[in-house]
């Protein structure tokens, strides 16, 4: 029998959650992570599935995700513990044929359930599937320290925030030319914040929740982690810059345009125009 804990997707989730914990982005039960799978990914592991998978209805139907499996982090679970007990802290779920709910096929033992941010994740998956023609498969939410800090001192405006991050590190425009979406502060774990996040995910692969954290999307766990890591590194540089009295020189608009041309990306126009 194949052991699902040795599968590429469980091992990938272990690495991503452990790395995020070591970065200091996911204290206690902070943060959540979901990866969209294919039936072929889980086909070898049916013997590992629960004999009677629990069924949980969704608060709103997700027709686009019908019959789709995911691996998800659990509600109230600590990222630091995923590596110690994957089955207790992760779960493989599969949305039913009409998108009304999902079965927990593996993991989430002792009656655990998926992350409370599952509505935000599933809604964002729907939008990123449409925006990227199915390329994006990962949604990651974490409490990246310096990005959160900047939401207290920068104008919480997409163009302003994006331009500052682009100027904070040269690679940022190349990694996220589509910029960073920003929400107003909202109560987490609700359909409302999920819908607002998904709306921004139509246009941006990164979405900030002021005074809370960040959502990122990408085609793989590595790409999504790297996206957030790149933005967070720039935020760290900016925090140091502001603590030293602010910028005396920076990357100019003309230089940002040249950077975009060199790497074949189209920078967010509103951020470039500032």
Swiss-Prot record:
- The Enzyme Commission number assigned here is 4.1.2.19
Entry's InterPro entries? Answer: Aldolase_class_II_sugar_metab, Aldolase_II/adducin_N, Aldolase_II/adducin_N_sf, Rhamnulose-1-P_Aldolase
CDD domains per the UniProt record, alphabetical: Aldolase_II
Q: What does this protein do?
A: Catalyzes the reversible cleavage of L-rhamnulose-1-phosphate to dihydroxyacetone phosphate (DHAP) and L-lactaldehyde.
Please report which protein family the annotation says this sequence is part of.
Belongs to the aldolase class II family. RhaD subfamily.
Cofactor(s) recorded for this entry are: Zn(2+)
Annotated Zn(2+) binding lies at 141, 143, 212
Cofactor binding note:
Binds 1 zinc ion per subunit.
Q: What is its main location?
A: cytoplasm
Active-site residues from the entry = 117
One biological process term from GO is: rhamnose catabolic process
Protein name as catalogued: Rhamnulose-1-phosphate aldolase
What chemistry does it catalyse, as a reaction equation? L-rhamnulose 1-phosphate = (S)-lactaldehyde + dihydroxyacetone phosphate
Query: Lineage of the native species?
Result: Bacteria, Pseudomonadati, Pseudomonadota, Gammaproteobacteria, Enterobacterales
Keywords on record: Cytoplasm, Lyase, Metal-binding, Rhamnose metabolism, Zinc
Q: Which GO terms describe its molecular function?
A: metal ion binding; rhamnulose-1-phosphate aldolase activity
